[in-house]
């Protein structure tokens, strides 16, 4: 069994040296379904969900089942863990350039303050350290 929270030195996708990790591969399919359900209790309706590779792909697939398909609803971009927000913003910019429409974002865990357009299910304390 893999631990969800791991005390380990590693380099994040953003290139930061971190001392603990949230290992989302530890979650079971039922836990991912529950996370999607929790997000839907707080989300505005969205047209479709798109997961950021690699961490957001499964969540995007599950949340896409809740998509309305309505052109007047935003597209939902999702990821598992947000550290700096760089991946979310970059994915948004690329998608918006190809498909200029309204977008919302959801992440399961946020290690820092997310961009204004991104919602967080579980927010870690924000510090200036």
Which residues fall in each region the model found?
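PRPP-associated nucleotide enzymes
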Residues: 1-129
